[in-house]
C-alpha cells in the first residue's frame, strides 16, 4: 500500500508553480489558565486542484482546527496556509463550508437559504440569473419539489442537501465538509455520498472532508489524511486510495485491496494511535 509520511518535503505540482493548496509547518497554540496548549504541531499538507481529500482521526486531534484555518475562520500560530499562492487570513467565497448541523436559517425556505448566499456574493448579478443559479443547484441535489418548504418542514437528509446546494451555488474553489453526514441514518448517508461524488465529478472543485467513517473515506477520497492524537497532533500518514473513478460501491467492496486499506486505517487509529481510554 502506498502511504506518505507526514514530514515529506512540499513538492510543487509543476516547475515554478505551487500546488493549489499548501499547509506549511502549521502549528496552533491556545493560551489557557494552565499555560499554552498546542493543538497542532508542524503540520504539512499539499493538495492539488480538484482533489478529494478526507481527514480522519480521533476526537480532539485537531481535524476541525486544521480545516478552520483553511476556511479562514482561524489563523495558525506558526506557519502558513496558502491557496493559489495567496495567504489565507480570513473567510472568503472561494471557500465554502458545510457543517454537520446544517447551519441553515430555519424561518426561510430551502430556496431562500440558497438565494441568500448567491445574492450576498453576487449583489450586482441580474435577478433572473440569481434565480436560475438557485433553481439549478436545488435541482442538482434533488430538491426542486421541496424548494418552497421551510427548513423546519424537511428531513435531516434534505437539510444537508440544501446546505450542499447553498455552498456550491457560489461556485467555490474549495468545498470544506465537516462531518456532513455524521448525523444521518445509514441509508440516507449512502445516498448523499453517491450524490456528493456525482456533484463533485461535475463541478471538480477541491474537497476537504472530515469524517470518522473509514468506509466513507475509502469510497469518496483520492487520499486519506490520518491524524495522530492530540495534543500537539500531526499528520501521521497519508494513504493514497487507488480505486478508479467513477466509483461503484459494490465493485470497490468486492476488491481485496479495499479490506487491506480498511484494516490498515483501523490499525492506525485503534492500535498505533489508540486513545488512552481505549
Curated annotation (Swiss-Prot):
What is the superkingdom listed in this entry's lineage?
Bacteria
GO biological process terms, alphabetically, are: monoatomic ion transport
Q: Which SUPFAM superfamilies match?
A: P-loop containing nucleoside triphosphate hydrolases
Question: What region holds the ABC transporter domain?
Answer: 21-254
How would you classify this enzyme at the top EC level?
A: translocase
Q: Where in the cell is it found?
A: Cell inner membrane
Instruction: Give an example GO cellular component term for this record.
Output: plasma membrane
The EC code for this enzyme is 7.6.2.-
A single GO molecular-function term is: nitrate transmembrane transporter activity
Q: Which NCBIfam families match?
A: ntrCD
Function as written in the Swiss-Prot or TrEMBL entry: Part of the ABC transporter complex CmpABCD involved in bicarbonate transport. Responsible for energy coupling to the transport system.
The subunit field of the Swiss-Prot or TrEMBL record says:
The complex is composed of two ATP-binding proteins (CmpC and CmpD), a transmembrane protein (CmpB) and a solute-binding protein (CmpA).
Protein family: Belongs to the ABC transporter superfamily. Nitrate/nitrite/cyanate uptake transporter (NitT) (TC 3.A.1.16) family.
Q: Could you identify this protein by its name?
A: Bicarbonate transport ATP-binding protein CmpD
Q: Which organism is it from?
A: Synechococcus elongatus (strain ATCC 33912 / PCC 7942 / FACHB-805) (Anacystis nidulans R2)
Protein's gene: cmpD
Amino acid at each position: 500500500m502506498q502511504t506518505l509520511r507526514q514530514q515529506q518535503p512540499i513538492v510543487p505540482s509543476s516547475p515554478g508553480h505551487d500546488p493549489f493548496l499548501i499547509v506549511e509547518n502549521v502549528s496552533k497554540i491556545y493560551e489557557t489558565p494552565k499555560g499554552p496548549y498546542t493543538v497542532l504541531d508542524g503540520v504539512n499538507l499539499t493538495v492539488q486542484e480538484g482533489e478529494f481529500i478526507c481527514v480522519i482521526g480521533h476526537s480532539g486531534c485537531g481535524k476541525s482546527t486544521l480545516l478552520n484555518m483553511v476556511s479562514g475562520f482561524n489563523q495558525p500560530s506558526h506557519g502558513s496556509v496558502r491557496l493559489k499562492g495567496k495567504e489565507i487570513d480570513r473567510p472568503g467565497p472561494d471557500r465554502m463550508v458545510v457543517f454537520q448541523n446544517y447551519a441553515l436559517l430555519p424561518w426561510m425556505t430551502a430556496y431562500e437559504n440558497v438565494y441568500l448566499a448567491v445574492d450576498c456574493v453576487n449583489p450586482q448579478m441580474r435577478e433572473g440569473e440569481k434565480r436560475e443559479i438557485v433553481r439549478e443547484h436545488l435541482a442538482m441535489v434533488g430538491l426542486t419539489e421541496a424548494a418552497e418548504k421551510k427548513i423546519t418542514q424537511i428531513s435531516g437528509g434534505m437539510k444537508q442537501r440544501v446546505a450542499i446546494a447553498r455552498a456550491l451555488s457560489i461556485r467555490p474553489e474549495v468545498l470544506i465538509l465537516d462531518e456532513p453526514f455524521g448525523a444521518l441514518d445509514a441509508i440516507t448517508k449512502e445516498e448523499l455520498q453517491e450524490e456528493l461524488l456525482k456533484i463533485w465529478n461535475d463541478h471538480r472543485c477541491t474537497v476537504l472532508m472530515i469524517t470518522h467513517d473509514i468506509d466513507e473515506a475509502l469510497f469518496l477520497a483520492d487520499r486519506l489524511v490520518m491524524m495522530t492524537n492530540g495534543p500537539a497532533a500531526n499528520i501521521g500518514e497519508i494513504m493514497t486510495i487507488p480505486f478508479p473513478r467513477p466509483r461503484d460501491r459494490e465493485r470497490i467492496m468486492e476488491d481485496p485491496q479495499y479490506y487491506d486499506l480498511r484494516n490498515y486505517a483501523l490499525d492506525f487509529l485503534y492500535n498505533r494511535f489508540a486513545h488512552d481510554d481505549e
